[in-house]
C-alpha cells in the first residue's frame, strides 16, 4: 500500500462517523465526517467529467463546482464518485483514473474544514443534463473549456492549473486557505 493509502487508512481509523439524514425515505446515509471544535473533517470523492477538453461543472451563485460529495461508511472512493454522479446528475457513470488526492483546508461561513478529497476522471454513460439536483436544490450545469478555467471562480481553485496540465500521473496536493 502506498503512502497516500496508509494516510487515508489512518485518517479513517480515527474519524468519527456522523449519521446524516438526507430525506430519502428510511435510508440512512453514513458519511465520513466529524467535527472537532470549529473544524469539520471529511472525506470526499469528486468527478472530473471531461469531453473535448471541457470540464462539466455546476454553478452556485458565482462559483463553479465539480460533481461530488462525501464518501459513505464502507464505500470505496470510486464507488462514491459513481454514486454521487448518479444522485446529482441522474446519469450512470464509470470511474476512470484517480487524478488527484487533495488535503484541502479552508474556511466557509465561519466554519473551518479539513477535507481529504479523491478527484477521479469520470465517463458519463449517458448525456450530461442541463441541471444538477442535490437534495431539494437545482443548479445549472455548464461545460467550461479547460483553457477558460482561469477565468471562473472554480472550487477548488487548484483545478484551474492542475487539470489542464495533468500528465496522467496521480498527484498529491496540499491546499490551505
Label each PLM-derived region with a short phrase.
Residues 12-15:
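Short hydrophobic targeting helices and cationic amphipathic motifs
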Residues 18-21, 25-46:
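Acidic, metal-coordinating catalytic segment for phosphate/diphosphate chemistry
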Residues 50-87:
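Conserved Nudix-box catalytic region and its N-terminal flanking loop in Nudix hydrolases
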Residues 92-101:
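A short coil-to-beta-strand element that immediately follows conserved catalytic motifs
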Residues 106-130:
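Active-site-adjacent beta-strand/loop module that shapes the phosphate/pyrophosphate-binding cleft
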Residues 121, 132-165:
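NUDIX/MutT-family hydrolases
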Residues 165-177:
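Acidic/histidine-enriched, glycine/proline-rich intrinsically disordered or flexible terminal extensions
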